[in-house]
Amino acid sequence: MRGTSAVCWSLLLLIALLSQNVTAKGGRGGARGGARGASRGASRVRLKTSSRYGSLRVASQAAAAGAAARAAARLSENTWRNNDHSGMDTQFGNSTNEGMYSYRAWTSGTCPLSSHLSFRLIISIGAILTCSSSSIYVSTKINLGK
């Protein structure tokens, strides 16, 4: 359960950080800018340092990427460990201990990881799409209201 939630949160953070909307206009714009700038003797072009590589943003992206990589590594490690069929039981025995004839193979709870993971992924993707569509609406409204 912890691994599933770690995977979902890492993917959610990673997608949210990588799909951040950077096209929205920042600062004061529109009619307020007319009272400043050329009318006061300053140059028209104002240089503003880019906050694209701010330390907090870079650190949070690195943490999200590290968490996603760690969760993916743990998930792949567990699948490799569970799919190891090189033992003597599976080669020469009838494989009834954990194989096809076991109780868990015929119940609906065979793989609880996939059901929880799919449910959380659907919820996460829905939240991301909702947030991204609202940010697109806000940025369009800002750009149209120049």
Curated annotation (Swiss-Prot):
4Fe-4S found in the keyword field: no
Sugar-modified residues: 94
Lipid-anchored residues (GPI-anchor amidated serine): 108
Signal sequence bounds: 1-24
Propeptide intervals in chain numbering: 109-146
Cystines in this chain: none
Keywords of this entry: Amyloid, Cell membrane, Glycoprotein, GPI-anchor, Lipoprotein, Membrane, Prion, Signal
GO annotation, cellular component aspect: plasma membrane; side of membrane
Record keyword Signal present: yes
Principal place of residence: membrane
Membrane protein topology class: Lipid-anchor; GPI-anchor
Xref: Pfam families: Shadoo
Subcellular location: Cell membrane
Family, per entry: Belongs to the SPRN family.
Function: Prion-like protein that has PrP(C)-like neuroprotective activity.
PANTHER family listed in its UniProt record: SHADOW OF PRION PROTEIN
Protein name, as recorded: Shadow of prion protein
Organism: Xenopus tropicalis (Western clawed frog)
